[in-house]
Amino acid sequence: MMNKKLKIVIVGGGTAGWFSAGYLIKKIKDCEITLIESPGIPKIGVGESITPHIASFFAEMGIKTKDWMYNTGAIYKFANKFVGWREGLDAEEEHFSFSFTADNSSLYKEPPEVTDQKLWPESDVSRTTDILIKMYNDGEIDKFDQYFNSQYHYMKKNVAPFNGTEYMLNPLWSWSQHINAEKAGDYIRDTVAIPSGVKHIQQKVTRVVYKDNTQVDELILENNEKITGDLFIDASGFHRLIVKQLGWKEKIYDCAPVRSAWVCQLDYEDHEKEMVNYTQSIAKPHGWMFKIGLWHRMGTGYCYAPDYISDQDALDEYMQMIDNRRMEPRNIKWTPSRLEKMGQGNVVAIGLSAGFVEPMEANALYIIMNTIRRLCEVIWDRKSNNEFNFDTFNEKISYSIDDIADFIKVHYTLSSRTDTKFWRDMREIGIKEKHEEMLLQKYNDPRNSMASTTKGWSLFPDYMWAQLAIAWGIDTK
């Protein structure tokens, strides 16, 4: 029986750090949490397109949607609008919605229980997507996303069914948001974490004292203070302040071509026209551009493949994309990767420390949220001597990030664009690696079922793989 408080130490004061602190202090009984934040470290945050999971994550901390949206400059989002990813379409057909949710989850009938992670067996149980794909293949419907996602029409008209008294969306509908990720972390810090007893230390970590590469004894701060704990969380972003010193191995996604971005925040020139209720993902000669509207401004960025274009040329292209508006662009570089194991011994990595592929498809905050939720399960199941079993945790988080990497990859490799060497090379990779066949495998993988996504296996349920196939013009017969 555990009779002493669990001491949790978090390194990193960004979104991952404060999300972890706020959620764990609410969900873990008898714990003490210390968050160490190095002053002066810039945070990565331009504007974040999120998935519906984040709103429920906030609700589990006792935060009302109205409150956090107001305090983070958030707006509602119905879909992701893709432009220019397919050749040969006229102006009206060149874009399509890509929904992360349906308005009524009871539409889904789950296939039989499968435990060995093989593909679904033949059965008489049909998913809604099975029926709609058959209708699409038979020519009975011609716009899969419009039939499958009724919220498509709200995106198209930039309108929403509001409850006028609260100025909130009608709760009969499911939705997501655009959020200022940096403000969200600060909001959790000020309204949940610190008021609930999280200790905040603003000091630089200079040394990690450890027994072996999985067991940390203490952290030494710049002022020589020693911080001990039972569980250490590395939420230090790309710096990986703890796990890098421990020498943890990482898996590199060699197939991920986009590894750099120019980003900036833009003021609206025409607020009513530019603030739209969908994420804009616009294919460009050497990558893609995002536009994410917030209430007070817009986050933009050009995510590009540095093997095909120089930083300066990419900046020049980016300036043209935003009509040479006055701005202060930042260049961000990363290695698409994840740790081979996100949790070992008494150490766990969360957020960018754990892994990052690229900004596409609103995955960054999802990975943070999913990792924190799964960590709670590990803590609840710990032994009396505070030994943590990360086996299932690592399996789920690893699959989740790998699945995100695959989903993003086929956006490029199954695109019909051929206007630059970048896009032609991507198509060759897709053909060589048989990515069309992979779509069917993903659609039929039990870990991508609706039930499995709620258990932390995948961000992208089976129906999103179906939407991707149809939207990219893949033969689904």
Identify the role of each PLM range.
Residues 283-335, 355-366, 378, 386:
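Conserved FAD/dinucleotide-binding core of flavoprotein oxidoreductases
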Residues 46-153:
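Dinucleotide-binding Rossmann-like beta1-alpha1 core, especially the glycine-rich loop
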Residues 377-477:
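Long, low-complexity C-terminal extensions of enzymes
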Residues 167-314, 372:
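Predominantly flavin-linked oxidoreductase catalytic cores and closely associated redox partners
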Residues 337-401:
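Conserved mid-domain beta->alpha element of the FAD-binding
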Residues 6-31:
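N-terminal Rossmann-like FAD-binding beta1-loop-alpha1 element of flavoenzymes
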Residues 25-46:
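Glycine-rich FAD pyrophosphate-binding loop
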